[in-house]
Amino acid sequence: MTRLTYTLLIVNLAAFALETQLGDTQLAALLLWPVGPHFRPWQLLTSAFLHANPLHLATNMFGLWMFGRPVERAVGSLRFAELYGAGLATAGVTQLVVASLLTDKVPTLGASGALFGVLAAFAILFPNRIIVLLFPPIPMKAWVFVLLYGLFELISGVGGLQPGIAHFAHLGGLFGGVLMAAYWRREYQELLV
């Protein structure tokens, strides 16, 4: 059963519907701002349920549906919640650190960081599962896909490619997912000893 995955899908859709009804001032208070006069601690959570536009929402929710269900089935809903939270937290903190080094102080939003945590766990739990990209339709193993995606995010972040996308937040979420999966692996090995 993948109740949490479906719950997260519904919450994100509902948040987007609400987001369209908020005024700019109300919405700005929920975005993740760099540490400074506009930053509030709750933004680490609220920003992860907001999306810039329908395409942003659709791609994140497609990824959550595609990768979240098998991961939640494998680890259970409680651990999936821990994983999602770890990806969300490490993405947010990474974004705050990177934003403190930049002169352009813009807010961020989206579930991508948490999704990258789920993606990392998927690659660790199902490394040999074949994923076929939508465009171009190239089949590859899950671990290869995640490695290449992570490298793309690193190159894009360092090179300043695709401005307006929080590449380092994505990498932070990926790191959070790897940490959780490594913790589970250690715990599992301790049970075997």
Q: Where do the language-model regions lie?
A:
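A detector for small-residue-rich transmembrane helices and their helix-helix packing motifs
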Residues: 1-193
